[in-house]
Regions:
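Active-site-adjacent helical/loop segments in soluble small-molecule enzymes
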Residues: 115
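Conserved beta-strand scaffold in the Rossmann-like NAD(H)/NADP(H)-binding core
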Residues: 63, 109-111
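C-terminal helical subdomain
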Residues: 111, 119, 123-167
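Catalytic loop of short-chain dehydrogenase/reductase
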Residues: 10-14, 18-36, 53-103
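N-terminal Rossmann-like NAD(P) cofactor-binding module of classical short-chain dehydrogenase/reductase
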Residues: 4-5
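Conserved internal alpha-helix within the Rossmann fold of NAD(P)-dependent oxidoreductases
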Residues: 40-45
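Conserved Rossmann-fold cofactor-binding substructure of NAD(P)-dependent oxidoreductases
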Residues: 1
Length: 167
């Protein structure tokens, strides 16, 4: 393996939508979003570890994160489950990256914020997005591939967006 991309995630589906207010939160949606967005990627990283410990070439494990998971970048509030799940993903994979650095030295992690991508995930929320800030899946994939091939080798994990801005 030289590149592994974990690109699962959920923001909404039938009966589940981002919470605008604290009063809209409840345990089942919080658990569902956390499980899908944070725990599933961690379990993939766990399952891959035995294979990557014996891998003889550098490998980048990428997970799709989101800037809304940043504590410092949260200026608007809302979206409790999604924000918390992406913050948890960032911390879980940072912790895993440190462990990998000790046991699978050729593995690096990239937490990638793709920006708002024209996809079913963002479709209900695109009305407030400028066309210049709504990216095609092809553009996002090309930016991701470029970043995966150009990481700083001395860092076990990097948080980058499509412009290579540190997140």
């Amino acid at each position: 393996f030289d590149r592994i991309t974990i690109c699962n995630g959920i923001l909404h589906h039938e009966g589940l939508s981002p919470e605008k207010r604290l009063e809209n939160t409840s345990i089942v949606p919080l658990e569902t979003v956390m499980r899908i967005n944070a725990f599933v990627p961690l379990l993939w990283v766990k399952a891959l570890k035995p294979l990557l410990k014996v891998n003889k070439k550098p490998c980048v494990i990428t997970a799709l994160s989101a800037r809304v998971g940043s504590i410092g970048d949260n200026e608007r509030g809302g979206w409790y489950a999604y924000r918390a799940s992406k913050a948890a993903l960032n911390m879980l994979l940072k912790t895993a990256a440190l462990e990998y650095r000790r046991e699978a030295k050729l593995v690096q992690f990239l937490l990638f914020h793709p920006g708002t991508t024209d996809s079913p995930l963002s479709k209900p929320f695109q009305k407030n997005i400028s066309p210049t800030n709504l990216f095609t899946p092809e553009f996002v994939a090309s930016q991701l591939m470029r970043l995966q091939g150009d990481l700083k080798p001395d860092l076990p994990i990097q948080f980058l967006d499509w412009l290579r801005t540190q997140g």
